[in-house]
Structures are given as C-alpha cells and as structure tokens.
C-alpha cells in the first residue's frame, strides 16, 4: 500500500513539475516575444516575467531537494549549502515579486481619494522598484545570519564527510532555513494581506456608488476588482499552504516519515505551479496565447489521427 501511494505521489510531483514549467514558461515566452516586437514592456509584464523566472527556479530547486535523499551519499556539505541557498533565493524573490504584483493590482485598480494613496499611485513604478530593492536587504540579512550560525556550528562536523555527517548538516540547514524563511516572510505576506483588504474596501465603496447611481455591478471596474481579488486570494492561500508544508516536511524529516514528506512536497509545488496558471487565466493576453497553443496542439493531434487515403 505504501509503495502504491509512493508511486502515485511521484506521478503527481512530476505532473506539477511539468505543469509549473509550462505555465511559467508560457508567461516568460509570451512577454519576451512582445518585448522583442514592441520594444517595450509594461510594469505588469516586467513583474510577471521576473515572477515566472523565479518560480521556474523554485520548482527546480524544490525537485532537487526532493531527490537529495537519493544523492546524499554522492554530494558534499558545500554542495548541500549551495542547494539550500539557491532554494532560499528562489523562494525569496517568488514571494516578494508576488507581493509586488498584489501591490500593483491595488494601486492600478483601487479608487481612493487619500492623498498618500494618490501619491504612491502616481509613483507606482518607483514604489515597486524600491520594494524589491528593500527586499534584497532582507535577503542579505537572512543569508548572513544563516552563514554566521553555520560557521559557529560547523566545527563539530569539520573533517567528517560521512553520510551521517552530511545528513546532520542538511537537517541543520533545513531547520535554520525554515525558521528564517518564516520570520523574513512575515513582512511581504502582511503587505499582500493589506493590499487584499484595501482592494476589498475599494470594491465595497465602488459597489455602493453603483447602487446609489442605480447601475449594474458588471462594469469593467467591478470586474477588474474581482479578478484581482481572485488572484490575491489564491496567492495568499497557496503561499500559506506552501509555508505550512515546509514546516510539516521538516517535522516529518526529523521523524523520518517519508510519505508525509512527499505529501508536503506535493503541497509546496502547488504555489509556483497553480498560481501561475491562475495568473494566465486572469490575464487576457496570456489567456489568448494559451488558447491559441491549445487549439494548435488540438489541430496537430487531429491531423495526425486522421487516416490518410
């Protein structure tokens, strides 16, 4: 029974891996082609490209961590550190770019008369750049803290390159990484949550104005509000599941529960894979491109299956 569940879980992980690479690859490819043809990119397209690239990297790093048990006897402690730091880098930018996307939707769609809101809306691109540059400071602080802690605790493993030593070092890296990721993800998560509630407030005010004017609630502004809210809700839920899966995976690893670890791996891959698909469905340009690709593939398959006379 365990072997059957293990096989099913492996198939699901591979499917998420392929789907995540395809969906994020579509975002990168479509926007890069537009960049080549039009010679410019909007702020939204720039955020989407960087977010998709970071998620492709995160998917690969997550898969690499999943197979580390099979490679544990053939890799060094330094290589394990490289894997962990690459995972931290991808996860960091995936979170902050998604937060920047939520902020962009808030200021581009919401209608507020507050002076500070109007000022930030006017300087939206500058605000996004400052947010991402500020996040680099959090990333540097995170890496420095882990590096210092590792240097202090590494002496007990110095000169010991056995499998048990590497496993102990990997467990130590996992423990510190999860703790730091949880601490340093509080601020971007709160920013995304604040953007979500402010957008709800903006939608509520907009619907009130529509009712006072006896107009329908299917105008473009209402549709844009609901579309952005759907993207934000999916991001918040999927990222919460992602963090919880990392924590549960760490506990399962300490208790040597491989099945729970695999289930958590499936959950952690949902965030970079499924949310990118939701972004495609919520973006008219990307949605049309994906439909064109599907129609083209359907025609190719139909022509191949049609018998020739």
Curated annotation (Swiss-Prot):
Keywords: G-protein coupled receptor, Glycoprotein, Membrane, Receptor, Sensory transduction, Taste, Transducer, Transmembrane, Transmembrane helix
Subcellular location: Membrane
Transmembrane segments: 8-28, 47-67, 82-102, 128-148, 183-203, 228-248, 262-282
Primary localization: membrane
Regions of this protein lying in the Extracellular compartment: 1-7, 68-81, 149-182, 249-261
A family per Pfam: TAS2R
Cellular component per GO, a single term: membrane
Protein name listed in UniProt: Taste receptor type 2 member 124
Stated role: Putative taste receptor which may play a role in the perception of bitterness.
A biological-process GO annotation: detection of chemical stimulus involved in sensory perception of bitter taste
Residues that carry a glycan: 160, 180, 255
Family: Belongs to the G-protein coupled receptor T2R family.
Domain of life assignment: Eukaryota
Membrane topology according to the record: Multi-pass membrane protein
Name of the gene encoding the protein in the UniProt record: Tas2r124
Positions in the Cytoplasmic compartment: 29-46, 103-127, 204-227, 283-309
InterPro entries attached to this UniProt entry: TAS2R
Further details from the record: Several bitter taste receptors are expressed in a single taste receptor cell.
Any GO MF annotation of the entry: bitter taste receptor activity
């Amino acid at each position: 029974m365990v072997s059957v569940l293990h096989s099913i879980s492996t198939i699901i992980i591979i499917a998420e891996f392929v789907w995540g690479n395809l969906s994020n690859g579509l975002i990168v490819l479509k926007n890069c082609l537009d960049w080549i043809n039009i010679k410019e990119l909007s702020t939204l397209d720039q955020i989407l490209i960087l977010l998709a690239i970071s998620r492709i990297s995160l998917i690969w790093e997550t898969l690499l961590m999943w197979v580390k048990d099979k490679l544990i006897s053939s890799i060094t402690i330094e290589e394990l550190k490289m894997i962990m730091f690459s995972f931290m880098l991808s996860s960091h930018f995936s979170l902050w770019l998604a937060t920047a996307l939520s902020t962009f939707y808030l200021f581009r769609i919401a209608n507020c008369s507050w002076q500070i809101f109007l000022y930030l809306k006017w300087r939206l691109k500058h605000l996004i750049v400052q947010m991402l540059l500020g996040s680099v400071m959090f990333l540097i602080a995170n890496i420095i803290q882990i590096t210092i802690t590792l240097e202090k605790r590494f002496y007990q493993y110095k000169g010991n390159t056995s499998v048990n030593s590497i496993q102990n070092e990997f467990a130590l890296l996992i423990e510190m990484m999860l703790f730091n990721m949880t601490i340093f993800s509080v601020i971007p998560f709160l920013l995304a949550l604040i953007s979500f509630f402010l957008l709800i407030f903006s939608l509520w005010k907009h619907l009130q104005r529509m009712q006072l004017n006896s107009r329908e609630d299917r105008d473009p502004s209402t549709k844009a509000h609901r579309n952005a809210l759907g993207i934000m809700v999916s991001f918040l839920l999927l990222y919460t599941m992602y963090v919880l899966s990392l924590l549960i995976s760490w506990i399962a690893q300490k208790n040597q529960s491989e099945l729970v670890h695999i289930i958590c791996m499936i959950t952690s891959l949902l965030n970079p894979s499924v949310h990118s698909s939701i972004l495609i469905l919520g973006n008219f340009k990307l949605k049309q491109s994906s439909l064109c690709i599907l129609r083209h593939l359907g025609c190719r398959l139909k022509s191949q299956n049609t018998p020739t006379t």
